[in-house]
UniProtKB/Swiss-Prot annotation:
A nucleoside 3',5'-cyclic phosphate binds at residues 560-677. Belongs to the cyclic nucleotide-gated cation channel (TC 1.A.1.5) family. Keywords: Calmodulin-binding, cAMP, cAMP-binding, Cell membrane, cGMP, cGMP-binding, Ion channel, Ion transport, Ligand-gated ion channel, Membrane, Nucleotide-binding, Transmembrane, Transmembrane helix, Transport. Residues 52-82 are annotated as: Disordered. This is Putative cyclic nucleotide-gated ion channel 19. The keyword Aminoacyl-tRNA synthetase does not apply. The gene is CNGC19. The lineage of its organism: Eukaryota, Viridiplantae, Streptophyta, Embryophyta, Tracheophyta. CDD domains: CAP_ED (cd00038). Residues 699-728 form the IQ domain. Residues 67-81 have a biased composition (Low complexity). InterPro entries: cNMP-bd_dom, cNMP-bd_dom_sf, Ion_trans_dom, RmlC-like_jellyroll.
Length: 729
């Protein structure tokens, strides 16, 4: 039997007619891949040839379905998988990054909620498609694609600023930056004076430690610079309306970072202190050029110090897009105190280096010798270049020794640091300088008397200005912190003042004023000044329901509501209003309208009937429960309302407070709504029996009716006995 077949080449062809996978964000259209062709190079395709018998290989191939005119020849022989650059997803680069692109901030309002659901799925689909295409196309450029793909796998994807990795890295960066800020001024203490030889030396042991630590912090900061090119950001123009939109395109991220803080970060990470202390200063130690180099060292350290503070403090205060680190009021106080200490550290370090320069200047002017001889004597590392006799003359020179005395030179504010420069202990030099800087900032340089040196005068003025700025900021933040702790008390005092002014304006009598003060005081103590209704407004319904169930647990203890369904209780809880009553307050009046049900939470009441009978009420009891029966009597079994007397329910008792009472009330209107919604349940015999049997009001009423019936029966028996005795006579 003849079969119609298609000639195929030696290269195996693949025929795909499967619908393309669909992920949320793609178009939902089904793409059918029914085109058959060679997997490598293609040639001219002849028309279909029909033949019988086995299939023989041919030189040309023909597709089963002709491609559309809009399709290119290459597109007909490839698997239709969207390339990375033309991805149709919004924020597709974040989704491709897997875990790095997921948002781990539960309070985020920027990242769409579908990120965490689709990142892993999209990442897997892309990798499988890429591998399929690499296997499918084993042409000459396959090795380059495989190499690029392997390199791409080693690099991190575009990272979400709210991902867990970025949050952890932010904490590492903050700690590293804090260490770097603390380390930078310590480079000033690496220079010291050996008093025995009257020369300047470098503490190489401490230098190795500081250079290593500074290099580690620079490496961490440099890694952070590289990560900034892979960190998505919120477009500033998108914050005008809405919560903002994440930008995850690599080129846009790089362009945004280059235009932003890239140059500042590169200046921060540049190892200027290491270069100065290891290369430049040792070459010119003991010369007059060293003075300018020390000035450069001081300037570069301070110029790097300020940008580091500019980058670190917002990071610690949580004002960055990478998440919060410290969020409490105590942390804010610690940050301000830390800023104060770092400023004192910088001031003390500059003071030490300036004192060292002043001592060196004194030694340079002490002995009139050549520059090379002076350098060999002042630089301890070049001491071997000077003769022994010359070194002895240098050590015993009176002018040189006078440089280390109080009256030997005009030191001004650096007088106490002269002998400090001779200390061999690095920690001693650092700790005393830190104490001096902290003391001067705290006292605003009140005990300093500078000399006529211009640099010394400006340094003192800078200390005063810095102290004023930091002290004002610290005091202001401490005041705000302490004020926030005492805010409730201030609100209570303002409320009390407003109430007093209102009572004075209305000219209330003194007895009413006293009662108003007691009510305000007890209400504030019961509620702690918090309006619970305002708090509930912005909460979801299920959370409100759970909170009310926790707060109103007493409803389950109330005898009337012990048999009610949870839905009825939830409806009642939604309508409860908090009330407070002071001692001797009257809740219900005799022959007055019963306008509410009162649920006692704390305190005691007493119910006085018409006959003078007293029924005590305490925590868990209810007064005004007759409203429930009255409202049920106005509802038909089908839920419709019948016409009731407009006067309402009249109370036949007095209810007053024996102590201060905290309670919740349910108004008549709210109770009518509940009874109309759940009339079928509330009219059941079980609930009606519980209401009548368990209610203190109905029990008192039943007892009174029993007493009336018993007395009536007793009178009837007396009449019968009297009539019987009269008949016997």
């Amino acid at each position: 039997m003849a079969h119609t077949r298609t000639f195929t080449s030696r290269n195996r062809s693949v025929s795909l007619s499967n619908p393309s996978f669909s992920i949320d964000g793609f178009d939902n259209s089904t793409v059918t891949l029914g085109y058959t062709g060679p997997l490598r190079t293609q040639r001219i395709r002849p028309p279909l040839v029909q033949m019988s018998g086995p299939i023989h290989s041919t030189r040309r191939t023909e597709p089963l379905f002709s491609p559309s005119p809009q399709e290119s020849p290459d597109s007909s022989s490839t698997v239709d998988v969207p390339p990375e650059d033309d991805f149709v997803f919004k924020n597709a680069n974040l989704l491709r990054s897997g875990q790095l692109g997921m948002c781990n901030d539960p309070y985020c309002t920027t990242c769409p909620s579908y990120y965490n659901r689709q990142a892993a799925q999209l990442h897997t689909s892309r990798v499988s498609a890429s591998r399929f295409r690499t296997v499918l196309y084993g042409d000459a450029r396959g090795w380059a694609k495989r190499f690029a793909s392997s390199v791409r796998r080693c690099l991190p994807g575009i990272m979400n600023p709210h991902s867990k990795f970025v949050q952890v890295w932010t904490r590492v960066l903050a700690f590293s930056s804090l260490v770097a800020i603390f380390i930078d001024p310590l480079f000033f203490f690496l220079l010291l004076i050996q008093q025995d030889n009257k020369c300047i030396a470098i503490d190489w042991r401490a230098t190795k430690v500081l250079v290593s630590l500074r290099s580690i912090t620079d490496l961490i900061f440099f890694i952070n610079i590289l990560l900034q090119f892979r960190l998505a950001y919120v477009a500033p123009e998108s914050r005008i309306v809405g919560a903002g939109q994440l930008v995850d395109h690599p080129r846009k991220i790089a362009r945004h970072y280059f235009r932003g803080k890239f140059l500042l970060d590169m200046f921060i990470v540049f190892p200027i202190p290491q270069i100065m202390i290891l290369r430049i200063i040792p070459l010119h130690l003991g010369t007059r050029r060293e003075e300018s180099e020390k000035q450069i060292l001081r300037a570069t350290v301070l110029f790097q110090y300020i940008p580091k503070l500019y980058r670190l403090l917002p990071l610690l205060a949580g004002q960055t897009s990478t998440g919060f680190i410290f969020e409490s009021a105590w942390a804010n106080f610690v940050i301000n105190l830390l800023t104060f200490m770092l400023a004192g550290h910088a001031v003390g370090s500059c003071w030490y280096l300036s004192a060292l320069q002043r001592v060196k200047k004194c030694m340079l002017n002490a002995w009139n010798i050549s520059a090379d001889e002076r350098r060999n004597l002042i630089d301890c590392a070049r001491g071997s270049y000077a003769s022994k006799s010359q070194r002895d003359l240098w050590r015993d020179n009176a002018s040189v020794n006078a440089c280390f005395q109080e009256n030997g030179y005009t030191y001004g504010i650096y007088l106490k640091a002269v002998n400090l420069t001779n200390e061999s202990s690095f920690f001693t030099r650092f700790s005393y300088s830190l104490y001096w800087g902290f003391q001067q900032i705290s006292t605003l340089a009140g005990n300093l008397s500078p000399s006529y040196s211009v640099g010394e005068v400006f340094f003192t003025m800078g200390i005063i200005g810095l102290g004023l700025l930091l002290f004002a900021r610290l005091i202001g933040n401490m005041h705000n912190f302490l004020q926030s702790l005492d805010r409730r008390r201030m609100e209570m005092m303002l409320r009390k003042r407003d109430v007093e002014q209102w009572m004075s304006h209305r000219r209330l009598p003194e007895d009413i004023r006293k009662r108003v003060r007691e009510v305000e005081r007890y209400t504030w103590a019961a509620t702690r000044g918090v309006n619970e209704e305002l708090l509930f407004e912005n909460m979801p319904d299920d959370l409100q329901r759970d909170i009310r169930r926790h707060l109103f647990k007493f409803l389950k203890k109330v005898r009337i509501f012990s048999l009610m369904d949870e839905s009825v209780l939830d409806s009642i809880r939604e309508r409860l209003k908090q009330r407070t009553y002071i001692r001797s307050s009257t809740v219900l009046h005799h022959r007055g309208l019963v306008e509410k049900m009162v649920f006692i939470v704390r305190g005691e009441m007493e119910s006085i009937g018409e006959d003078g009978s007293v029924l005590p009420l305490s925590e868990g009891d209810v007064c005004g429960e007759e409203l429930l029966t009255w409202c049920l009597s106005s509802i038909n079994p089908d839920g419709t309302r019948i016409k009731m007397p407009p006067k309402g329910l009249v109370s036949n008792r007095n209810v007053r407070c024996v102590t201060n009472v905290e309670a919740f009330s349910l108004s008549v209107a709210d109770l009518e709504d509940v009874t109309s919604l759940f009339s079928r349940f509330l009219r059941s015999h079980r609930v009606q029996g519980a209401i009548r049997y368990e209610s203190p009001y109905w029990r008192l009423r039943a007892a009174m009716q029993i007493q009336v019936a018993w007395r009536y029966r007793k009178r009837q028996l007396q009449r019968l006995n009297t009539a019987h005795s009269n008949s016997n006579r």
